[in-house]
Amino acid sequence: MASNPNFNEKTSALDVAHHYASQARNKTVLITGVSRYGIGEGIARAFAHGGASTVIVTGRDDTRLSLVVKDLTTDYPSVKFHPHKLDLTSLEATRRSANEVLEDDTVPKIDFVVANAGGAFLGPRQLTPDGLESTFAINHLGHFLFVASLLPKLRLAAKTSAPGDTRVIVISSTALHISPFRFADYNFDGNVVPEDEAPNWAPIKEIFGFEEHEGYSAWIAYGQSKTANVLFAVHWNTLFSHEGIFAFALHPGGVKTRATDEVSDMMAKEQKAKLPDPFEKTIDQGAATALVAALDRELTPEKGVFLNDCQVTDVPPYADSKDKAQKLWKLSENLVAEKLGSALQLA
């Protein structure tokens, strides 16, 4: 449980930031996937509201970044907002982007990283320039490389902060219930998937009407990527919690954004009615759980790494298994080394 049991699905991120202002004040935050009218903007706005001194906002489009920075600066003129280009579809571009952050002397340390970018990419299977299934590449592997590369600046923050005050927050989803991580066929190349990695077809059939089938499914791809987000947090804590850098994953809720409007528009009325978490939260409400995960000192990895509606909650055993988390971390390291020709250095 979070330290405030009254926080719930209706809680405002601005209220959370005000409640934990002592934790946000004068801190440096980096948030991926920030654009106008999205959850990332809501998270950035809340950190600024709580008194953060520097907020780095990343995205693929320079024009969109400049627009959101203009909006945020107008409302919070005392906060330094840094736009930073990040394209998670390319591992080389991701590495280059991370190195630019590391080389930026105006940002000596980073207290919080919020891995918010990504989404569900409906339609047929798509591959990135690295030959990876796009949902896995963007939602997990790109963030794995980017966040892990920022470890030196997270460590600098941790050295001058109380243990656990430096954190990595990963935006996951309750869609993790759709599928475990498919180690046997994470890229949807057609390999046989063992029973313990098979998807849960029941909610897919109930909501979307899809019968069980072989081959690619955008929803299964999304589900396994959200499971990967939690496993990333689990193994991050194994590696770095002793250094005072914690990681948590969370479900922001069904948030009404432009992106979810596009998904909603593709669904029939009957399908929308069956959604366990319809797109009814405001952006401010959707950002609230990320603020709790970042700022509540009562949270520790031992109490749980996944939050929903501002409270710690359980996930299926396959999503917080330390063995599976370690296995995914190793797979991710190997893929980065294979695609980039050099290993990720974390020592």
Annotate the PLM regions.
Residues L154, A294-E298, V336:
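Short, hydrophobic alpha-helical segments
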Residues D130, S134, Y216, I220, ...:
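Short coil/turn segments at secondary-structure junctions
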Residues S225, A273-V312, K322-K324:
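C-terminal helical subdomain
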Residues V57, L86, P278, P317-D320:
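Pocket-edge positions in alpha/beta enzyme catalytic cores
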Residues F7-K256, D261, L346:
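Rossmann-fold NAD(P)H-dependent dehydrogenase/reductase core
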